[in-house]
């Protein structure tokens, strides 16, 4: 991937427009998790340290275009950002009528981009309006890279210079390292409740990886494809044939989809359900498979420890309930101990990594969510394509 990077630009005396993803959650009117704001600090600080003035833009929530409601206001985000930077960050509501006059080191924020008409439709005129504010446009919002919108794609076409911020460049470099030129053997973990939501990822990764570990409801569908009984476990019977094709594709290239030989079952999906370890052949009609068993976890852990590259998306069991967390914990710890380059993404995966205290031992943790999944699928990300076009 060829694209310009913010850290390679001379921004002295220039106005830099940064598209960040500061779409943070609120609870009782207060920001409950500022991870996304903190993730954007590196690019903002780089510009401040190098004599630029900074305009930040972000979306917040799901407002109706052309309408402004108090809950859509980015003012709390600007105030929190200001607290982290140690300076006042003013919100600009009328930036189209009154172009801001800024000094080096100033940081301001545009009002919520999603209230602007034409934002979601990637309106070129709106993109030009954003671009008119700056000398350099920086996209640092990997989480929205799979969407072609005026603040991510059209602005990149229109700005004098368009480049990737520190966070965006880090994501793209890590994903490129993991998927374009992976160290072998390459192992992927794809888990979740449904094959249907991850089918294109499974098919895409089956072309790339040496071992494809599946977990959760996805594994149950693959177990059905192998003719195993899964009791009343969550599975998709209509995708058994697709699962067989993926296993055949892996086998044809000398790889495999290693399925559990033992599992942890319960009679109910509840926090206090009794967990019982069983061989897969002993699963009863009224059993629900809620985790992989210790024998399977140990075998998969050995695979991960010997890997050159690991891509992880999804916990292999109901890790929120401690009695069904053993499988995910064993794999998380194996990845942490492995010399492999590891990249992990997806909300549940990040929650599991945090729960088991291995955050600092994962090679790269993607902030992307949907963008991370679409990259795994091999899809072109519009905002990234726009940066590549400008960097050519």
From Swiss-Prot:
GO terms for biological process: gluconeogenesis; glycolytic process. PROSITE patterns: PGLYCERATE_KINASE. SUPFAM superfamilies: Phosphoglycerate kinase. GO terms for molecular function: ADP binding; ATP binding; phosphoglycerate kinase activity. InterPro entries: Phosphoglycerate_kinase, Phosphoglycerate_kinase_CS, Phosphoglycerate_kinase_N, Phosphoglycerate_kinase_sf. It is found in: Cytoplasm. GO terms for cellular component: cytosol. It catalyses: (2R)-3-phosphoglycerate + ATP = (2R)-3-phospho-glyceroyl phosphate + ADP. Pathway: Carbohydrate degradation; glycolysis; pyruvate from D-glyceraldehyde 3-phosphate: step 2/5. Its EC number is 2.7.2.3. Its main location: cytoplasm. Keywords: ATP-binding, Cytoplasm, Glycolysis, Kinase, Nucleotide-binding, Transferase. Substrate binds at residues 21-23, 36, 59-62, 114, 147. ATP binds at residues 198, 320, 346-349. It comes from the Bacteria. PANTHER family: PHOSPHOGLYCERATE KINASE, PHOSPHOGLYCERATE KINASE 1, CHLOROPLASTIC-RELATED. Monomer. Belongs to the phosphoglycerate kinase family. This is Phosphoglycerate kinase.
């Amino acid at each position: 991937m060829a694209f310009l990077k913010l850290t390679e630009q001379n921004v002295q005396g220039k106005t830099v427009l940064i598209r960040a993803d500061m779409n943070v959650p609120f609870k009782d009117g207060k920001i409950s998790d500022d991870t996304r704001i903190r993730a954007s600090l590196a690019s903002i600080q780089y510009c401040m340290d190098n004599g630029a003035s900074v305009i930040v833009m972000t979306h917040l929530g799901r407002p109706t275009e052309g309408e402004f409601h108090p809950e859509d206001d980015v003012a709390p985000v600007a105030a929190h950002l200001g607290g982290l930077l140690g300076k006042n960050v003013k919100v600009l509501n009328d930036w189209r009528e009154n172009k801001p006059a800024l000094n080096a080191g100033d940081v301001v924020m545009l009002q919520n981009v999603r209230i602007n008409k034409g934002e979601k439709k990637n309106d070129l005129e709106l993109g030009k309006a954003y671009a008119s504010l700056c000398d350099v446009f920086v996209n640092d919002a990997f989480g929205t890279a799979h969407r072609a919108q005026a603040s991510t794609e059209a602005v990149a076409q229109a700005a004098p210079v368009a480049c990737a911020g520190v966070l965006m460049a880090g994501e793209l470099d890590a994903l490129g390292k993991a998927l374009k030129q992976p160290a072998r053997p390459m192992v992927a973990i794809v888990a979740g409740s449904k094959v249907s939501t991850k089918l294109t990822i499974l098919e895409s990764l089956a072309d790339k990886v040496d071992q494809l570990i599946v977990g959760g409801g996805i594994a149950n569908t693959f177990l059905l494809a192998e003719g195993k009984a899964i009791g009343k476990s969550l599975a998709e019977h209509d995708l058994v044939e697709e699962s067989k094709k993926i296993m055949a594709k892996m086998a044809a290239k000398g790889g495999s989809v290693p399925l559990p030989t033992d599992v942890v079952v319960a009679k109910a999906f509840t926090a206090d359900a009794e967990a019982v370890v069983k061989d897969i052949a002993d699963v009863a009609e009224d059993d629900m498979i809620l985790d992989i068993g210790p024998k399977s976890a140990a075998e998969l852990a050995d695979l991960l420890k010997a890997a050159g590259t690991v891509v992880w998306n999804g916990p292999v069991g109901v890790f929120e309930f401690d009695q069904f967390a053993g499988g995910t914990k064993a794999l998380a710890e194996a990845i942490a101990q492995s010399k492999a380059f590891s990249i992990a993404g997806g909300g549940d995966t990040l929650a599991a990594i945090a729960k088991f205290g291995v955050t600092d031992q994962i090679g790269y943790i993607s902030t992307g969510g949907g963008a991370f999944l679409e990259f795994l699928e091999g899809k072109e990300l519009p905002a990234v394509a726009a940066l590549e076009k400008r960097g050519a």
